[in-house]
Amino acid sequence: MPYLIVTYDIAEERVNKVRKILKKYFMWVQNSVFEGEITEGKLLKCKLELEKVIDKEVDSVYFYSLENRLNYRKTVLGIEKEITGNIL
């Protein structure tokens, strides 16, 4: 199962809608950053939901895919938000 890091740059009036969608699929780790494992089917569903909300002329959502969550290293400077878990 791929492990994704998702970041976004969204116009203020759509930020809450985008955040709400991403929270259904990923763990929220910072203001505009989410991460987590996801199936291809759920990833497709997430992207379809986002496409209905974003304005492709001004908004951006970036998906960084890693083979799995064991093949990357994360270093945090400062406080790391508590991850309570995510059911996919």
UniProtKB/Swiss-Prot annotation:
The keyword Nuclease appears for this protein: yes
Which parts form a coiled-coil structure per UniProt? Answer: none
Enzyme nomenclature, EC number: 3.1.-.-
Keyword terms? Antiviral defense, Endonuclease, Hydrolase, Magnesium, Metal-binding, Nuclease
Q: Which molecular-function annotation in GO is an example for this chain?
A: RNA endonuclease activity
Instruction: Specify the signal sequence span.
Output: none
What processes does the entry annotate via GO biological process terms? defense response to virus; maintenance of CRISPR repeat elements
HAMAP family named among the record's database cross-references: Cas2
NCBIfam families in the cross-refs: cas2
The protein's job, in short, is:
CRISPR (clustered regularly interspaced short palindromic repeat), is an adaptive immune system that provides protection against mobile genetic elements (viruses, transposable elements and conjugative plasmids). CRISPR clusters contain sequences complementary to antecedent mobile elements and target invading nucleic acids. CRISPR clusters are transcribed and processed into CRISPR RNA (crRNA). Functions as a ssRNA-specific endoribonuclease. Involved in the integration of spacer DNA into the CRISPR cassette.
Tell me its family. Answer: Belongs to the CRISPR-associated endoribonuclease Cas2 protein family.
- List the protein's name: CRISPR-associated endoribonuclease Cas2 3
